[in-house]
Amino acid sequence: QSVHKTLPSLTQTALLHIKCNRPGGGCYADRERIDRYLHMVQSSSPSYLLMASIENSIFQMEHMDMMSYGRQLHKLRSRLGQMRHLRLADTGIIGQAGIKDLDISKIVVSTRGTYLVSQENGDTGFTGARLDDILRREYHLEMEMCGADYVTAITTAMDSAQGLERLGDALTRIDSCLASRGSDARRKNGKGPVTGTDDKSGGEDMHRGSVYSMRCDTAMSMGEAMDRNMKSVGLEDSAGCISGEFVYIYPPGIPIVAPGEWISGPTLEVILEYRDKGLPVQGPADKSLRTIRIVQKD
């Protein structure tokens, strides 16, 4: 767990949790094996500054008014749940696509099916990247990440009530400039967040088509692929080839395709869509994302 993500701790600080509450006692993981591997990679000169930072963050959290933070979060989520076009991911997504629970401190807002009505350009599709850009440029709010049709804002106990209100103001103002495609009654009536229970296009719609639900078949090990001769081909022509490079969106930095994996047609379609929507697709040596390096056939 990266402590520095949501707690007041210095960058690089993190914890490794080991669950040790098995029925009858003991840990679910092999602690001796974990220790053996840790000794291979950890420094023999730990940073006392970083360790003290972790302890200080724990001390601060023990003395903070978490109840007040929780109330402010629920107030914000209730407000965002009334948006007519943008949609807040809420508890209804639990149980779908492997989702086990919901962290209410993460504000995930979907733009799917919405568009910005512009007098000059007509109806313009509204993407996650577009929402992310508007929040940054016009409202000076930096999101944690954006996808093709969503943004994620991470709140912490260090956020003030005024700061959370600013986020709510920005999203509701943007929502007032949008319209929605289709005949989604929830949107027309402005009734609540996405719950996935009374609207087939609701909770499921938040994750449908996610590239992370796809799996690329492995043709060879990553090490073998990295040592093979490679060549560059047009990204659009790479379906059916063995990738010689990583392709990922950062954040979060989870590989979409890794060296040694077959580039499938469906995965390529999503990568091209993300590229064309201006998402931060990274990994290939060609920063323009026009080409990708693939493993040459023998």
What name fits each language-model region?
Residues Q1-D35, Q42-S53:
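Active-site PLP attachment segment
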Residues S78-G192, G196-G283:
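Conserved C-terminal alpha-helix-loop-beta "cap" of PLP-dependent enzymes
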Residues A52-D65, M158-Q162:
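Amphipathic alpha-helix from the class-I
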Residues R31-E32, I58-Q96:
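Conserved PLP-dependent catalytic core of the aminotransferase class-I/II
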Residues P284-K297:
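Terminal helix/beta-alpha structural elements that buttress the NAD(P)+-binding lobe
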Residues A14-H17, I58, A170:
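Short secondary-structure boundary/capping segments
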Residues T6-P8, Q42-L50, D65-S68, Q72, ...:
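Short, contiguous, pocket-lining structural segments
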